């Protein structure tokens, strides 16, 4: 079952990568990459369906195998996404891009495997949920503001990081709901960070630096969820030099991706 879980998770990563590449292709080709305009584009909608399929396969894989096997397979989406995006733009990813993506993936796998598992109940009161939404909202707003004065690659990274923060907050709130802390306003609040994250991500994709935006999202999302889990749910954090080295590796790979030429700019 473990091998089957790994294979399903790998296929899920492929679907997620395809969806991200399709959405980036459409967002980068739209003068105003807002949701109303993108929702009228069939290819962008197909990308959304592919992402949902990838998420569904990931959930199935988690039901069949251990987290330590399934989660690293999810990181493979970054390695799939770059060649797919390059093909859509009629280009070929450079060796430098693929190497940088591999470095990011290696760092992410290290971080995923080093996060301690928590066996305790997941409970968050109304004040905790309010804190979760406020902190993620302020952080993403600051990143949005910073993107206004950044270079193109920096803008893509900051917007995607803001999106990852909001997606991490969404994942944390969803975990609280799944574990039984049902509250009607929790359910009403859940779509807010998710929709804001989607909007910020499309803005990041529209900049054109797909590699750096997708890598930034892949890093910020799980790290935010881990941070909120530690701060608000009392979950353990990884400690020691190895997690720090893994984080540095992922960051270095993202910086290297930021220094590459956007796919759309190549001739």
Report each predicted region and the residues it spans.
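Polytopic alpha-helical membrane proteins, predominantly small-molecule transporters/carriers
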Residues: 1-267
């Amino acid at each position: 079952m473990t091998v089957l879980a790994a294979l399903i998770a790998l296929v899920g990563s492929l679907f997620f990568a395809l969806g991200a590449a399709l959405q980036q292709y459409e967002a980068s080709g739209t003068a105003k990459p807002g949701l109303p305009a993108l929702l009228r584009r069939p290819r962008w909608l197909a990308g959304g369906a592919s992402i949902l399929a990838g998420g569904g396969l990931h959930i199935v894989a988690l039901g069949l195998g251990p987290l330590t096997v399934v989660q690293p397979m999810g990181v493979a989406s970054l390695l799939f996404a770059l060649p797919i995006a390059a093909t859509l733009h009629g280009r070929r990813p450079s060796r430098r891009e693929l190497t940088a993506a591999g470095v990011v993936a290696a760092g992410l796998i290290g971080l995923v495997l080093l996060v301690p598992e928590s066996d305790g109940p997941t409970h968050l009161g109304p004040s905790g949920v309010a804190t979760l939404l406020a902190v993620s909202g302020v952080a993403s707003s600051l990143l949005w503001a910073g993107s206004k004065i950044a270079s193109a690659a920096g803008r893509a990274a900051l917007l995607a990081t803001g999106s990852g923060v909001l997606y991490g907050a969404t994942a944390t709130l969803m975990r609280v709901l799944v574990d039984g802390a049902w509250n009607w306003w929790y359910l009403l609040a859940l779509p807010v960070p998710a929709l804001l994250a989607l909007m910020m991500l499309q803005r990041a994709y529209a900049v054109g630096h797909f590699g750096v935006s997708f890598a930034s999202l892949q890093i910020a999302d799980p790290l935010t969820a881990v941070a909120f889990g530690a701060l608000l749910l009392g979950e353990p954090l990884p400690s020691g030099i190895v997690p720090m080295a893994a984080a540095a590796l992922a960051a270095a790979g993202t910086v290297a991706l930021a220094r590459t030429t956007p796919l759309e700019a190549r001739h």
